[in-house]
Amino acid sequence: METKPKTATTIKVPPGPLGYVYARACPSEGIELLALLSARSGDADVAVAPLVVGLTVESGFEANVAVVVGSRTTGLGGTAVSLKLTPSHYSSSVYVFHGGRHLDPSTQAPNLTRLCERARRHFGFSDYTPRPGDLKHETTGEALCERLGLDPDRALLYLVVTEGFKEAVCINNTFLHLGGSDKVTIGGAEVHRIPVYPLQLFMPDFSRVIAEPFNANHRSIGENFTYPLPFFNRPLNRLLFEAVVGPAAVALRCRNVDAVARAAAHLAFDENHEGAALPADITFTAFEASQGKTPRGGRDGGGKGPAGGFEQRLASVMAGDAALALESIVSMAVFDEPPTDISAWPLCEGQDTAAARANAVGAYLARAAGLVGAMVFSTNSALHLTEVDDAGPADPKDHSKPSFYRFFLVPGTHVAANPQVDREGHVVPGFEGRPTAPLVGGTQEFAGEHLAMLCGFSPALLAKMLFYLERCDGGVIVGRQEMDVFRYVADSNQTDVPCNLCTFDTRHACVHTTLMRLRARHPKFASAARGAIGVFGTMNSMYSDCDVLGNYAAFSALKRADGSETARTIMQETYRAATERVMAELETLQYVDQAVPTAMGRLETIITNREALHTVVNNVRQVVDREVEQLMRNLVEGRNFKFRDGLGEANHAMSLTLDPYACGPCPLLQLLGRRSNLAVYQDLALSQCHGVFAGQSVEGRNFRNQFQPVLRRRVMDMFNNGFLSAKTLTVALSEGAAICAPSLTAGQTAPAESSFEGDVARVTLGFPKELRVKSRVLFAGASANASEAAKARVASLQSAYQKPDKRVDILLGPLGFLLKQFHAAIFPNGKPPGSNQPNPQWFWTALQRNQLPARLLSREDIETIAFIKKFSLDYGAINFINLAPNNVSELAMYYMANQILRYCDHSTYFINTLTAIIAGSRRPPSVQAAAAWSAQGGAGLEAGARALMDAVDAHPGAWTSMFASCNLLRPVMAARPMVVLGLSISKYYGMAGNDRVFQAGNWASLMGGKNACPLLIFDRTRKFVLACPRAGFVCAASNLGGGAHESSLCEQLRGIISEGGAAVASSVFVATVKSLGPRTQQLQIEDWLALLEDEYLSEEMMELTARALERGNGEWSTDAALEVAHEAEALVSQLGNAGEVFNFGDFGCEDDNATPFGGPGAPGPAFAGRKRAFHGDDPFGEGPPDKKGDLTLDML
């Protein structure tokens, strides 16, 4: 496998401080918008907000910077001083440490700080405790306001800091350069800005963390230097401790959170650090091993090596250390993407008032709630993968044989309260007697404490997490009996509630109540086997290889080695370009909208009769046939492309960026991205641990320090080997830029000096850039040299991919969506006897069962039936896509892919297909959905919720999430969405004798099924991705939103549809009514679309619901609903006195000599058998012969 050579790119960045404190009067306009985007708990005056140009930073804000991180002695006598600079970029979050109370809290949930403190103690993580001496030197927000002339009661102060030095601020290793403050303009308001510099500036050649920053007599302070007052603000330090360091500590399994902060800060200051950064006295979680193996974490009779769990604990801490070092490298990266600018947001275009803009932002954030819910409720989510398990050596007889998969991440959320053990496996004092929960089979409930741990015990992030969970569906349309919040709150006044966070008046918004409402979706950890990681990421490129056949016949495969062609010429002959031409031509015909593949174009005005249907289908077929023929001719004759081999190598592929500014403008979404990246880094590091351990004395006290650099180097060597692509940058200072810094002798209130000299310490660095995710198009059997286990796994998959021989129902075939949508126009007389409503289910069911009276069919009807049947049968004969088209876009792309598969002699197995589940939002569908936002609680809860619903437009945050599925991913990916998907990273060596470790990021599944996302379906032939579009939100225009649905109800309804029959609509309605009862009336058209993926049936359901309400005089009655359904069923079941019936089974049979139905005078081609040419041209001919010599298309 060849990789691209690493090329260095020179990029110039301006010098600057490591951060700024922004101080401003609380803005009168836009504060509601800022509150929506921020994370704040109601019991704290602090918040975390996104870095947004025009909202929190000024226009022209420079995100990349060469940070002044220290000083060096220069000159012959070492008397001169120059500055040391390190590249970095500003964090995508800003930290409000004074005036946060002016921002509305993210949730009304009470006492989240108390919950986080309790959870922190319960799981053994350290709390933030400033030293007593530090408190004497605090720089308060009030003092800063007084100095800047701001009213402390109306001021807003927040820290904007570079990514690599957040921890340095947290441990008081910085100071405010008060003399360097200036003013900028944000949103038309004047804002003060105070630069923040590191204390190491006053300690030449000191590249470490300062343990005692308030010691003004430190021996490393330069001679005659005026040491400044370190910047210590208790609310800010606690906020950084909880929101920045806490999540990293949870992900890296380090209970000493302060040690994580110091380790990260040290890596930022010391560019030459190689050894271990995490402390030697780190503790580990004791848990019982999965699958009957020996206990991990605890002692097992004093055994050493793998049997005693020692290597598992060693791999755990070393992988965490390597991940922290890798995150430090990424924090020093320089990115191309500028920070998001609120004035350029498409969702705010045309919104003239602040309230309208806030409403638009609230609707968008509700979209993201679907992705947040998936990350919380998926059992293989990166949020839960916090422990390391040991599968044992690959060869029990030879422990030195390396294995990439020996150590792996497992869900640890439910075992976090287990006893803590030390390096040797002894239980740490204070944890004796604690029960040990098993990795698998535990009975623990997912509780508020677990949710707090997922957020790093940060009340602000926990509040934002609840903001999203309050907008998630807990089962209101899924057949589950979702909790009635009104009744629960009312009953709780007379019963004991196991919650000490809320009172009767605040119970409706309590974290416990929200989790109770979502209880049916809680993660259930039933497996601890090695598997995929559920990751949150962002597509930052409009390009992806997500067409039906992926990157088949791609540019790189067609490019000639001599470079004699232009890129444009090559691109015109790719499969991708062919699909674009097909879609463009269909868009010209007004059949499709390329930007919204699920849209029906203008078909409603085009298909007004049966002739128009013929025209549409024939046009689609001819356009595709022409492009496929031209494509294959170019590939075979023009380029001698190995088109069959190319199909076997084709992949669906996309890239997830590591650029922090590409993520959504929300601190919690940024947390999900960070935790996902840390899980990926640890997965890569764990794969190399066994190779580092092999043949070494791992019990040695100095082993970690000695071999941590080896592990780190091995992980770095995995860059650009198939999965984690990196970019090598040479960083230089901007031309002509003066290095301004505080005077080292005049004090921190003196103006900045610009006479300093300095240079960049890290000149050339390789920065990870993106993660490459792919999925093979074809189902590939096990190779000849595969292991027996691999062959067994492949054998178990074959049945899932095997194409069945059964004939597919016409309505479930390629034209089913058109036949249902336009049945009245195609067959106006296709209605049950006694009914005035044309019914496609009744018509096609009676037709295919040979029960339709022949007298009901005209000659034109019969011609159309012949046309539809022939196309459906011929399409089915070559179809290897396990999905029926839902629109013309899918019909064209599926038909095109199947034609190419036919050319390539593909047979037997379905191919892998992709489905995007697009997150959408809507206003609350019921009063219950708005309960958590009610201004009144207790006895007035229902009245408060109804009042909110009556004036819902006045509440910008009153939106809930919904979903829609789309099987054509390229336009979805072109919207550069935030995504959630499963990722399984394969590792393997290259050619024989090559020790390079290559990787493949395989597109996998989220575990947890419909708990993770209601539209997830267990189908091995399909790969799913949850997507929340960013670029203009173009996919939302399809309006195909959907509510959630549960496995039992979903599969039941889909089963009814797949069985067919005349009474499909009434059967679906009856099943839904019996499952949901009165909640059926709450289902909107988008909910039915999500449940059924059938627009015609969805409209039928809405009509039946309306008739049921009308029958009940406006009130819902289950009896009335069932009565309406049975009447509809009776109507379509009537066939009357049929007389002679139309024999659909024999019609269009394969006997070439059969006389067409209707007698000898009937037109021949329309009624010919399957083997007869259709209009003189059979588009479904035989496959290509074996290759003999040079191929031409005519030979195919």
Swiss-Prot record:
Residues 1174-1196 have a biased composition (Basic and acidic residues). It comes from Human herpesvirus 1 (strain KOS). GO terms for cellular component: host cell nucleus. Signal peptide: none annotated. Keywords: DNA replication, DNA-binding, Host nucleus, Metal-binding, Zinc, Zinc-finger. The gene is DBP. One of its GO terms (biological process) is DNA replication. InterPro entries: DBP_sf, Viral_ssDBP_head, Viral_ssDNA-bd. The keyword DNA-binding applies. GO terms for molecular function: single-stranded DNA binding; zinc ion binding. Belongs to the herpesviridae major DNA-binding protein family. This is Major DNA-binding protein. A zinc finger (unnamed) spans 499-512. Homooligomers. Forms double-helical filaments necessary for the formation of replication compartments within the host nucleus. Interacts with the origin-binding protein. Interacts with the helicase primase complex; this interaction stimulates primer synthesis activity of the helicase-primase complex. Interacts with the DNA polymerase. Interacts with the alkaline exonuclease; this interaction increases its nuclease processivity. Residues 1158-1196 are annotated as: Disordered. Residues 1170-1196 are annotated as: Required for nuclear localization. The keyword Electron transport does not apply. Plays several crucial roles in viral infection. Participates in the opening of the viral DNA origin to initiate replication by interacting with the origin-binding protein. May disrupt loops, hairpins and other secondary structures present on ssDNA to reduce and eliminate pausing of viral DNA polymerase at specific sites during elongation. Promotes viral DNA recombination by performing strand-transfer, characterized by the ability to transfer a DNA strand from a linear duplex to a complementary single-stranded DNA circle. Can also catalyze the renaturation of complementary single strands. HAMAP family: HSV_DNBI.
